[in-house]
Amino acid sequence: DNIGKLLKTLDEMGIADNTIVVYVSDQGYFLGEHGFFDKRMFYEEAARMPFVIRYPKKIPAGKRLKDLILNIDFAPTLAEFAGVKMENVQGHSFTGNLEGKTPADWRKEIYYRYWTNHAIRPAHFAIRSERYKLIFYYAKNLDMTDTENFDFTPAWDFYDLEEDPHENHNLYNDPKYAPIIRQMKKDLLNLRKEVGDTDEKYPEMQELLEKYYK
């Protein structure tokens, strides 16, 4: 109701077409899905963030993006709409995407990492494309505080989000997906290098990757 009041006021003031309105929040929370509460694990319920934007002068109403957007893209996008170009930032403006002109080189995959290590949610990193998700649970404390020591065999999860949108079936050992998984492992390494998250200062991680990255 209050959002409606805000939009109505902008209309009454005659500035709606020249005002950007954004509705956004933090990541979602688990409410029992996968046996979890809170967030942190890289399932869709906790990985996604709502982002609704209205800017009549530039953005067609009713449009829904399928492009992979990260929260580091928010600031460059709003800055560009305001006529400011941000430099030396990790995010990318998606003004073109919102206007229906997604760049040909727009990201096809995203990288995720959760560092803190607990038995209920082991430390992990992951890659997600529009359709597939690959997660590696390495379960090492490294230099993190607020961690636990526990016995855990490193493991992979792989989900086909088109066939299994609720991520109930780990298909990592399904031979049908072996070629896709091999390629995503390569892409995951490339993304880790791209963002400077290669664990070079952790010899135990290098040994772990050599053993399980097959």
Regions found by a protein language model. Give the residues of each.
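Low-complexity, glycine/alanine/valine/leucine- and proline-rich hydrophobic stretches
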Residues: 124-157
